[in-house]
A protein has these predicted regions:
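Flavin-dependent oxidoreductase catalytic cores
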Residues: 1-263
């Protein structure tokens, strides 16, 4: 092995003091293999255990924090207390070989699939029509009410509590890839005229809610990460200038890492 790669195998300490055995991370893999109700299936466990063997952190597939947020079939759920037992099995499998196990907490927003959403009621920061996972025709999303936005924020906090109860070492907040948090940051998706027109207000509120749950139910060792997409093709969309401002805001919060997803 070339010497320039050797640092990848060195231990690294996160801002919260947790030590990782190396610098390799298994990014979340969309496997569409959870049970229809979002509970963890027997197929998932050996799949994720095998892939978690030699990394420092392993992150489970995007897990919906609310039934009004499911973006693809076979998506794991962290929306209900009844999900916790299956999530315990998942966390155990992910940690079996020494990796820190995180669950990615997620809300699809406009990318929700109507057939997987209660009453087919897809919500987004502003009204929009688009194609999502596997769709040949567009579906429409309506604008979220203030109450629905506040509930979505609380849902991320409750998902964090469930992750803690299930034995995960942390959560990754999914703020990338055109899903709900990304949509609030993007001027393409967020055309509101109220307080939520501030594109940084929603992601910051979600992080604050997650950190509040961490403080209430866990300790400083619980890892909190944030995933973002720095640019998008849509116009007007997220630019590097917008992302720089977002990073300036969230990097001053007690999170442990930022995960960049180039989509």
């Amino acid at each position: 092995m070339k010497s320039k790669y050797e640092p990848l195998f060195d231990k690294v300490e996160l801002p919260n003091g947790v030590e990782l055995r190396n610098r390799f991370v298994l990014a979340p893999l969309t496997h569409i293999s959870s049970n229809d109700d979002g509970t963890i299936s027997d197929v998932e466990l050996p799949y994720i255990e095998k892939r978690s063997q030699d990394v420092g952190i392993t992150i489970n597939a995007a897990s919906n924090v609310s039934d009004v947020g499911k973006a693809f079939p076979g998506q794991p759920s962290i929306a209900h207390d009844s999900d916790i037992e299956g999530l315990k099995r998942l966390a155990t499998a992910m940690k079996k070989n020494g990796a820190k196990a995180l669950v990615q907490i997620h809300h699809g927003g406009a990318q929700e699939l109507p057939e997987l959403t209660p009453d087919g009621d897809v919500v987004a920061p502003s009204p929009i029509s688009l194609k999502s996972f596997g769709q040949k025709q567009e579906h429409s999303a309506r604008e979220m009410t203030n109450e629905e936005i506040e509930q979505a924020i609380k849902d991320f906090g409750e998902a964090t509590r469930r992750a803690i109860e299930a034995g995960f070492d942390g959560v990754e907040i999914h703020g990338a890839n055109h899903y709900l948090i990304h949509q609030f940051v993007s001027p393409y998706y967020n055309r509101r005229n109220d307080v939520w027109a501030n594109q940084y207000k929603f992601p910051v509120a979600v992080i604050e809610e997650v950190l509040k749950a961490k403080e209430a139910y866990s300790n400083k060792d619980f890892i909190v990460g944030y995933r973002l997409s720095p640019e998008e093709a849509e116009s007007p969309g997220i630019t590097m200038e917008i992302t720089e401002e977002l990073v300036n805001k969230i990097s001053h919060m007690p999170i442990d890492y930022i995960h960049v997803s180039m989509m």
